[in-house]
Regions:
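Core alpha/beta nucleotide-donor-binding catalytic domains of modification enzymes
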Residues: 2-209
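Short, surface-exposed helix-loop/turn micro-motifs enriched in polar/charged residues
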Residues: 129, 194, 198, 222, ...
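Internal, active-site/partner-interface "lid" segment
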Residues: 196-203, 221-232
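Conserved anion/nucleotide-ligand pocket segment
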Residues: 207-222
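Solvent-exposed, charged amphipathic helical/linker segments at domain boundaries
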Residues: 63, 223, 255-257
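AMP-forming adenylation/ATP pyrophosphatase catalytic core
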Residues: 3-36, 54, 58, 94-96, ...
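Residue-level detector of well-ordered alpha-helical segments, enriched
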Residues: 136, 205, 222, 271-275
Length: 333
């Protein structure tokens, strides 16, 4: 892909998703030091410098402290950004060495938490991320293999909103190779992560399957179009299930939610699954994706079959039928 097409990709993204960019004063971009995020940061800086000079670009690098070279890589990003107009670099630090288990997930959560806090403090509403077509491909097949439901299979949208912050991904139709070539042409030195070639990681194994599947017609463009349809159908189902949730809600307390069970049994399986998931989310104090779809479906099927639903737990909540089958209760464990 030519440089002009990549520049057009970023410009088109602003036109489509940030049409009021004249009112925007600051944007941020997450940069690890790899080719993907550095290419995106450079493209954004070019856009800001040429067309949106009123916008300041905040380049954010999180130093997890998990690898000896992490600090050097963060400083390397700063040395590159120091020569750019309209751009500043910030290193956000998190000490991951104190985490004994689930280090990768905790590091990912910490990364987003630190960047979100920075954006809140500086009034930034748009955080750009360097996810590309290859990342989308890997994410889809990882989630498919794990049995994800429609929400999970929708993968990454060009823009998603979390706690008022717009997460922007303009490169979902581009390849890693496109971005490496861009860095080479612009003489941008990037850092290589050895784990990107290590077969012990699930993502790497799926990445190597792309060559075969792309030869059968599964391009990044075709995959993203399919995922867009999945997200549209999911949103419609989400709106409908929320309407039914409110209609069938009998009582909501701090630690318990009661529903009209007779009316619940008249709903489709997918809708009831969504009601169950929302109840868990509203009672849960923990972050995360919640119970696996398969487990939620098993509970929901048993509830709808009406053959003596047994009290059970799921997602740290207790599910039981009360008052001779008239009410369905979800309470904190």
């Amino acid at each position: 892909m030519s440089q002009s097409l990549l520049h057009s990709t970023v410009s088109d993204f602003f036109d489509l998703y940030i049409p009021n960019s004249n009112a925007v004063r600051d944007i941020a971009v997450a940069v690890s030091g790899g080719a993907d995020s550095l290419a995106l940061a450079h493209l954004l800086n070019q856009k800001v410098s040429s067309d949106l000079s009123h916008i300041d670009l905040h380049v954010l690098t999180v130093d997890h402290g998990l690898r000896p070279e992490a600090s050097d890589e963060a400083e390397h990003v700063g040395s590159i950004v120091s020569s750019w107009k309209n751009a500043t670099h910030q290193i956000l630090k998190w000490d991951g060495r104190s985490a004994e288990t689930g280090i990768q997930e905790k590091a990912r959560n910490a990364r987003y938490d630190l960047m979100r806090e920075y954006c809140e403090q500086h009034g930034i509403k748009f955080l750009f991320l360097g996810h590309h077509g290859g990342d989308q491909f890997e994410t889809f097949f990882i989630r498919l293999s794990a049995g994800s439901g429609p929400e999970g299979l929708g993968c990454m949208a060009p823009v998603s909103v979390q706690n008022g912050l717009n997460l922007c991904r303009p490169l979902l139709y581009q390849s890693h190779e496109d971005l490496v070539s861009y860095c080479q042409r612009e003489d941008i030195a990037w850092c290589e992560d050895p784990s990107n070639e290590d077969d012990k990681y699930e993502r790497v194994r799926y990445r190597k399957a792309y060559e075969v599947l792309s030869s059968e017609g599964l391009s990044y463009k075709r995959l993203n179009k399919t995922l867009e349809r999945i997200r549209q159908m999911t949103e419609s189902a989400h709106v409908f299930s929320n309407e039914k949730y409110d209609e069938l809600l009998i009582k909501k307390e701090t630690d318990r939610i009661l529903f009209n069970l007779e009316c619940i049994k008249a709903l489709p399986l997918d809708t009831v699954c969504r009601i169950v998931k929302r109840a868990i989310e509203e009672l849960s104090d923990e972050r995360g994706y919640g119970p696996r779809t398969e487990k939620t479906e098993i509970l929901t099927k048993d509830l709808l079959e009406g053959k003596g639903f047994r009290k059970r737990t799921l997602g740290k909540c207790i599910f039981e039928v009360l008052d001779d089958g008239e009410k369905f209760s979800v309470s904190k464990e």
